[in-house]
Amino acid sequence: MNTLIEKYKKNSNFRLAVQLLFILVLSRVVMLIMVPVYNGIMGTNRSFSFLMNEWDAKRYQFMVDNGYTFPLDTDPQANWAFFPMYVIVCQFVKLLTFWKADTYWVGMFVSNVCIYIAAYFGIKWLRDRYEINNGTQPDINNNYGILLGVLMFMAPYSFYCASVYTEAMFIMFIVLFFYFSQKKQWLIAGLMSAFASATRIVGCTLVFALIIELYLDYKNKNTVIDSKKAGIWQNVRDFVIHFIKMPKEILSVMLCPLGTFIYMTFLRFFCGDVWAFMHVQIAWREDSYFPVIGVMWKACTGQIEPRYTYMGWFCIAAFAVYAYMIYRKYYSMAFFGIIALLVPLTSHVMSTCRFIIGSFVIFIGAYDLMTAGGREYLELKNEKKIITIDSIVLIIFFALELFLLFLWYNSDCWLM
């Protein structure tokens, strides 16, 4: 015991792992406590695993146990829309139990492990970024960055990361992508993007984030002509010339969409349509709007259901956060967040709240607003005021998460 205490005091990585585990367990205990609260209010007697796994979770449960729907099956909502990475990992974990464990519990275990890993490396990314920008390490004894873990475990809509949904795994691969990109380990970053693209289609768009990271790295090494002395196009041209001479960087970029390409190849032989994951989407979304602009106009002006009006304005808020992140020089993250949101907005605003949370970068924007960026804007220097404001924001976030969790347990359509 004394050895562990000593290790906790001296080893910052071990201390971070323990702190995050405590926060994760605490957040999940709250979810457990909400089960009898929900059952008492609604007069039901449902289990935790039942309440935590709505809608798509049931499809993932079916896929883990039975695989993809065969082309001759009559289900109009064929599960080809769901990418395979999460299912494969859940199947492997269930195999370790000799197929005895309940699939929902297997999926929740995988999701919680993934979001825990994501939070750990997300904070490591923050601390490395601080050191790069300031030339000195942050005060880790003051738990620098731990707020990010609190947001990822307890912020509104974070319950998706505890259920049998792909959000936690997708976030993990995104975090690892940015973590290794910051360390200039481009091949590993490309591999993480490949895994992300095998988890959700928008994982492919990490290729743009990688190109931005490569460009910024090249520019920071002073190998690109100063943009004040030369136009932006000359800078880009010089970067492209450099890029095509670097096979390692080219391979890293080519790896990014590999997961999606492998899945498309599988679909070609399985059902004869490489775009089946896209074509089957019509079973969920019958409405037809002009991409992005038409979708947002219809939603934000209340021309469709009230829940979609809410989601439309939620998207507006997300775009505002991404714009702020560009101002704060989180370039690759901000552009990834924008592109990842534009993809679903080509058809509808349905589920965009989940997609925004599931792209991870919104957590970084919120974290920056609650720490350095927000303090700079509000010109806050009094530590007590800072702590008070952050505490109020966290309490509001936690209250919203409890409210949304109750709606989730109740299968409320506002979360679809």
Model-assigned labels for residue ranges:
Residues 1-42, 244-255, 385-394:
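Start-transfer (signal-anchor) and selected internal transmembrane alpha helices
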Residues 27-39, 43, 52, 195-196, ...:
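Membrane-lumen/periplasm interface segments of specific transmembrane helices
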Residues 54-69, 75-99, 293-294:
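Short hydrophobic/aromatic helix or loop-helix immediately within or flanking a transmembrane segment
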Residues 90, 106-133, 321:
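Transmembrane-helix motifs of polytopic, lipid-linked glycan transferases
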Residues 101-105, 122-154, 171, 331-335:
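Transmembrane-helix signature of polytopic, membrane-embedded enzymes
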Residues 114, 146-181, 188, 195-208, ...:
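Multi-pass, polyprenyl lipid-linked donor-dependent membrane glycosyltransferases
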Residues 135-142, 177-188, 218-221:
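Membrane-interface transmembrane helices that cradle and orient dolichyl/undecaprenyl
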Residues 253-257, 373-415:
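Signature aromatic-anchored transmembrane alpha helix within multi-pass, membrane-resident enzymes
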